[in-house]
């Protein structure tokens, strides 16, 4: 479900402060965050943000195509291992 246009984009204040601090200092270290709900802004382009997926932090390099999307879209939380094989029809020779 998309966000209403009258509400505008959302970013957590603590993440915005970290981004501005990294831009000001020019540090290349990834920013660790648990804020999957924050929208990617143009000022984040070129930064690496480590997004938590519930188990570990996934490093995400921000490019210009990602602007407007949420950080959580790039750190999947579920692993898909495929459907189980039907044990009755293993191999027919």
Curated annotation (Swiss-Prot):
GO BP of this protein: ribosomal small subunit assembly; translation
InterPro entries named in the record: Ribosomal_uS19 (IPR002222), Ribosomal_uS19_bac-type (IPR005732), Ribosomal_uS19_CS (IPR020934), Ribosomal_uS19_SF (IPR023575)
GO terms assigned for molecular function: rRNA binding; structural constituent of ribosome
Keyword Transferase: no
Keywords: Ribonucleoprotein, Ribosomal protein, RNA-binding, rRNA-binding
Pfam families, per the entry: Ribosomal_S19 (PF00203)
PROSITE patterns cross-referenced by the UniProt entry: RIBOSOMAL_S19
GO terms for cellular component: cytoplasm; small ribosomal subunit
Gene3D superfamilies: 30s Ribosomal Protein S19, Chain A
Superkingdom of origin: Bacteria
Family membership noted in the UniProt record: Belongs to the universal ribosomal protein uS19 family.
Classification via PANTHER family: RIBOSOMAL PROTEIN S19P FAMILY MEMBER, SMALL RIBOSOMAL SUBUNIT PROTEIN US19M
Role according to the record: Protein S19 forms a complex with S13 that binds strongly to the 16S ribosomal RNA.
Protein name: Small ribosomal subunit protein uS19
Species of the source: Blochmanniella floridana
């Amino acid at each position: 479900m998309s966000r209403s246009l009258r509400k505008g984009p959302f970013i957590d204040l603590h993440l915005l402060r970290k981004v501005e601090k990294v831009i000001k200092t020019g540090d290349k270290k990834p920013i660790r965050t648990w804020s999957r709900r924050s929208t990617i802004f143009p000022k984040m382009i070129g930064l690496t943000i480590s997004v938590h997926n519930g188990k570990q932090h996934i490093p995400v390099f921000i490019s210009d195509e990602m602007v407007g999307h949420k950080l959580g879209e790039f750190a999947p939380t579920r692993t898909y291992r495929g459907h189980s094989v039907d044990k009755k029809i293993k191999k027919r020779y």
